[in-house]
Amino acid sequence: MSKDIIKEYGNVLHDPASITERPLEVLSVGPKLDIALGGGVPEGSLFIMTGPEKVGKTVTALTFCANAQKHYERKVYYANIEGRLKKRDLQGITDLSLDAEKMQIIGSTEGNILSAEKYLSIIDNIVHTQPGSLAIVDSFSALSSESELTGDLSDMQVMSVQKVLAKFCRRISNVLPINRVTV
């Protein structure tokens, strides 16, 4: 039986004695949030920051990116869904050692508007193939599903973004801690 499982799925069977604890690093977001979170955000987790417009969520996310690069040497991916991230925002964070050259911005371009499915597929790919990275999604509330972007405005039978997000979260939840990716 064991040989059949290994043949079909690879080396997925482990002796209980071989299981070791891999302590997860706690990544610094910024001083105030670190205090509120008991030190920061554990790597390999999905961290959602909410709040009204113009309270500093994007600046906090960029500070998180700078800390991830500076202190933990993380690859950083930033999904600029709202399209509001500007060069001046990145320049304002250079004092915090954000290396914009080592950061990948994911965003729609003229003639190529990314749907929720496409954005989340890109992030899903990062989660599965870029261990130890940090992926920022700015912001979930700006996501529009493919059917919302291309469908008839009178058609109420569209796949909601909430369903897309739920599927995305289920897909990545077990992979995040194994690959130590923080979203």
Summary of predicted features, one role per range:
Residues 1-100, 115, 120-128:
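The Walker A/P-loop phosphate-binding site
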Residues 47-51, 100-111, 153-160:
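Short, basic, glycine/proline-bearing loop/turn elements
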Residues 74-76, 103, 133, 181:
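Residue-level recognition of the N-termini of beta-strands and the immediately preceding loop/turn
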Residues 79-82, 98-108, 140-141, 148-149:
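Intrinsically disordered, low-complexity linker/loop segments enriched in Gly/Pro
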Residues 111-183:
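P-loop NTPase motor core
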